[in-house]
Amino acid sequence: MMSAHKYELMFIADPELDERGLKKLTEQYLELVTKEGGSFDEPDYWGRRKLAYEIAGKTEGNYVVVKYTAEPATSDELDRVLNLNESVIRTKILRKG
């Protein structure tokens, strides 16, 4: 990897997803990171929480936070594919340091 950076991803998934479905969804996206030569820490599942305001007709969501290292293009692609999934209500990727 030439220019890998550290990132923190938080996404909010549909509250209707059970624990197994949420883990499967998370693993699907983290595969993209490893396939492109990146690495990640163990995902932190915060569970179902009330949203500050309604998003896409939902008042609750399953929160997941993952720290990972990847190239900027991989991070951009991860954000793009997360936003295409209807089970993902909101995403935020922050570059760390």
Curated annotation (Swiss-Prot):
<keyword id="KW-0689">Ribosomal protein</keyword>
<keyword id="KW-0699">rRNA-binding</keyword>
<dbReference type="InterPro" id="IPR014717">
    <property type="entry name" value="Transl_elong_EF1B/ribsomal_bS6"/>
</dbReference>
<dbReference type="Pfam" id="PF01250">
    <property type="entry name" value="Ribosomal_S6"/>
</dbReference>
<comment type="function">
    <text>Binds together with bS18 to 16S ribosomal RNA.</text>
</comment>
<dbReference type="InterPro" id="IPR020814">
    <property type="entry name" value="Ribosomal_S6_plastid/chlpt"/>
</dbReference>
<dbReference type="InterPro" id="IPR000529">
    <property type="entry name" value="Ribosomal_bS6"/>
</dbReference>
<keyword id="KW-0694">RNA-binding</keyword>
<dbReference type="InterPro" id="IPR035980">
    <property type="entry name" value="Ribosomal_bS6_sf"/>
</dbReference>
<dbReference type="GO" id="GO:0003735">
    <property type="term" value="F:structural constituent of ribosome"/>
</dbReference>
<dbReference type="GO" id="GO:0006412">
    <property type="term" value="P:translation"/>
</dbReference>
<protein>
    <recommendedName>
        <fullName>Small ribosomal subunit protein bS6</fullName>
    </recommendedName>
</protein>
<comment type="similarity">
    <text>Belongs to the bacterial ribosomal protein bS6 family.</text>
</comment>
<dbReference type="GO" id="GO:0005840">
    <property type="term" value="C:ribosome"/>
</dbReference>
<dbReference type="GO" id="GO:0005737">
    <property type="term" value="C:cytoplasm"/>
</dbReference>
<keyword id="KW-0687">Ribonucleoprotein</keyword>
<dbReference type="GO" id="GO:1990904">
    <property type="term" value="C:ribonucleoprotein complex"/>
</dbReference>
<dbReference type="GO" id="GO:0070181">
    <property type="term" value="F:small ribosomal subunit rRNA binding"/>
</dbReference>
